Amino acid sequence: MEQIPFVSSAPNTLGIELELQLVDPRSFDLAAASDELLAQLANHPIADRVKPEITRSMIELNSSVHEHPAGLLAEMREMRDVLCEAADAVGVGVTGGGAHPFMRWQDRAISDTPRFQYLAEMYGYLARQFTVFGQHIHLGVPSGDAAVRMVRGLSPYVPHFIALSAASPYCEGVDTLFSCCRLNAVNSFPLAGHMPADVTDWYRFEAHLAQLCASGLAESIKDLYWDIRPKPEYGTVEIRVCDTPLTVERACQLAAFAQALAVQVARDPEPSQQAWLAYRSNHFQACRFGLHGSYVTPDGQRVRLVDHLRALFERLAPVAEELGTGDMLQTLRDEILRNGNDARWLRGQFLKVRELPLVVESMAQNWRGQGVQDTPPSAVRRRIRATSEPVGGVCALSTPQGDPLPGWAERLH
């Protein structure tokens, strides 16, 4: 069995990756413009932190390593501004959000790299449907054994990350009734899911991966689309379930939450095997109903996820004070409990403007840090008619009376 070296990292360090949407500033449909944007940034100092993604309507923005989320936020704001300036130069918009509200997967162009071309050949249409946008949070750990313990400790909190970050209620022009529909695309891949419960240390992780490779089920760790996975070449644990938020501020708040939670779970006893029994159900509840899903705790109690999350914020408050991140966690807590997640905000925008292209326009404004400006629906219709391929079929799931149902996923519990 081949040993996998694990690069040691300082505990509690953190970094993030954000997968971002590139949109046409007239129609607000996705734009296959990653090559042009990357060329525009080629001579800029942040060039090595902006990467192509599986389709040409996406790019990935990578932070450096930070000890404190405040430094992360300063860097992400600077990179956001540079990215938006470059995007303006090539005539494209940039936005967050976990899924584009009305894109057609059939129209996506695969990026011209060997790995992405291989994925397109291997997975067929799933590769184009994988035009979804996530935030990955990296947490530094000193060893492979520590990484496996961290994955196991964080796994019961996967629903909390999903609900906090959910920003993908719409897909192909309809309200999916999910807070997070993005993970339905991720879960189509054969090695999606969670780390097996019997992987309890780095040796067992190496053995598990070796077995997958020997069976032809995987070629490397990159093929493990787990919700949380070790990243040995970085010396991190990577949380992969978050939708890309609508702002860099929310992205860094989520990173601060992850950092405090990682410190707490390192102090806690390891969850029992029973914690894995409800994993898939908890995952579904968070995707479908967001903050108002139900949650089965590691000891088997069924509660509302929002109530468990409220208690978790209280539990993490002393840890956040130790880390100097109390204000960021308090802001996240207050905004989430008062206003809900980004999925709820997006549905609220649709109720105001009744046009999904206008919703995307407001997403792009939010990403720039400009706030939302009112744009008459007639203006976006003029922009759509001006394009060569007008957007059609934009609608929301509705009642027999024709009233949209954007609140189902927030009201059922």
Swiss-Prot record:
Gene Ontology biological-process annotations: modified amino acid biosynthetic process
Stretches the record annotates as Disordered: 392-413
Any one GO molecular function term: glutamate-cysteine ligase activity
Keyword Nucleotide-binding among record annotations: yes
Xref: Gene3D superfamilies: 3.30.590.20
Top EC class of this enzyme: ligase
Protein's job: ATP-dependent carboxylate-amine ligase which exhibits weak glutamate--cysteine ligase activity.
Record family assignment: Belongs to the glutamate--cysteine ligase type 2 family. YbdK subfamily.
Record's protein name: Putative glutamate--cysteine ligase 2
Species of provenance: Bordetella pertussis (strain Tohama I / ATCC BAA-589 / NCTC 13251)
